[in-house]
Amino acid sequence: MGKTVLARSRKEGYVPLLYPPYGSILADVHDQALSAAETGRGGIKKMENAIKRNMSSEGFTAKKLAFIGLFGAVASVLMFLEFPLPFAPGFYKLDLSEVPVLIGAFALGPVSGFFIELIKILVHLVIKGTQTAGIGELANLVIGCAFVLPAALIYRAGKTRKRAVIGMITGTLVMTVAGCFMNAFVLLPAYATAFGMPMETLVGMGTAVNKAVHDVLTFAVLCVAPFNLVKGIVVSLITFFLYKHISTLIKSV
């Protein structure tokens, strides 16, 4: 339990707090409740409204936190359902874990989308561990955010189907560019260092599926870019058809 302290409200009195960061909020509620009680009518209702206003100002309600956890858990499960694509090396596998992340980001906001993405990675790490020295998980987090956050920010500016489509197209393009950059300059060198293999070996895996791949740049353009484009399109289509039904369910809870 947190240490109980006393915080002075704006009126002459003290209110008990569990911990200091919420002192001003509880003091505000205390003062508003006293004022409501002094009127003699509607005091309880005004006190409830005061609590709701101050809770909403914190940004994360209990309902929102519950949905963030739920979407993160579903996304982590979907990470186990993965399959390779014929034009990418075997260590690139497509999964649908970004679907609940994107739906959650549309419904709850881009910040919530980031936390759903983070929970997805952490839960998956706890359950399965890492086979890539954490590099694959970091890549999933960064590139996933590159897809979800632009889409959610655009949709948040005007919640229409048109905005959703524009957001998902933008997110797909940003993810594709970010994926190429990250793989060419960060992830592939990190893989090579972590597993003690030359870059030529990794590039050779790309050459095995596409003869035009002969260096890191062509690997990124001919293997990574198509992979992320396909992933963005598939996730966007599924989200487009599911979102309305799931958002209605969220609002009804």
Question: Where are the model-predicted features located?
Answer:
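Loop-helix junctions at membrane interfaces
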Residues: 14-26, 30-33, 38-253
